[in-house]
Amino acid sequence: MSLSGIITALVTPFDRDGAFDRDAWIRLLDMQLAGGVQGVVIAGSTGEAATLTDAEYDEMLCSAVVRVGGRVPVLAGTGLSGTAKTISQTKRAADNGAGYALVVTPPYIRPNQGGLKAHYLAVAEQGGLPVVLYNVPSRTGCDLLPETVADLAGHPNIVGIKEACASRERVQALLALRRPGFAVFSGDDSSAARSMLDGADGLVSVASNVLPSAYRHLCDLARAGERGAIDLWNARLSDFHAFCGLDSNPIPIKALLQRIGIGYGLRLPLLPLSVCHHDIADHLADQVAALEALSSRKIVTA
């Protein structure tokens, strides 16, 4: 199953006591599928993977694979600070039924480009899953440069990249080096339409947790080259783009989800959305149903 279009980086819903909320998880998955998403990421940074136990990781992934039932690709976040641990986590994801591993650059370690290349080649060769590279320097402290991606993209088990840098030049550099079978995804909601108009294959989105149909529509417009319609639709979503940047991800998006009845909070060291932002959260939550209803009538088959 190939990767393209809108993929949601799912949150992990917790209950009032901070435990994994399986019922809310299933409802979130169902909402994504009904909204037309073309893939889901389990236990990535948006999913607070660093706070999950092994048992929770297994339960989330297994239940998602069963619920999705092969309708869309399931990507598992498996990137950890060490290469051996990342390989082990990737094997764990494979055992739980994931179709792909989304592997972030090793956080905190700050390897050089040679180290990053060796790391990803080891995971691709030993992890047991097709690998999607994930570059998010603002979180990890290291930057996977396009020339390193060019070297890695030739490996048959490295099938794409999620690039969270919003720089147009960065995305264009990645597009210039890609080969058939290697997908380039934006990891930035606000600039994704522009990236897709330039040739990117899709978006791995945070805001689509609450607006799956709306972001599917955005991606459909971009893939169809509808520049005028994209500008209008992006304007409708601009407040959501801005809101998701008010605090560390996934604090804002989980505040919106809580307001529509999915989950109750985060795990330390993350704290709930500041009270000073509650009014805007309430305002945006009130818009969700109308935006989803409007965009669900506009989804086209890709």
From Swiss-Prot:
EC number: 4.3.3.7
Entry's localization field: Cytoplasm
Pfam (any one): DHDPS
SMART domains: DHDPS
The organism's place on the tree of life at top rank: Bacteria
Active site: Y134, K162
Record-linked Gene3D superfamilies: Aldolase class I
Task performed by this protein: Catalyzes the condensation of (S)-aspartate-beta-semialdehyde [(S)-ASA] and pyruvate to 4-hydroxy-tetrahydrodipicolinate (HTPA).
Protein known as: 4-hydroxy-tetrahydrodipicolinate synthase
Organism: Xylella fastidiosa (strain Temecula1 / ATCC 700964)
Taxonomic path: Bacteria, Pseudomonadati, Pseudomonadota, Gammaproteobacteria, Lysobacterales
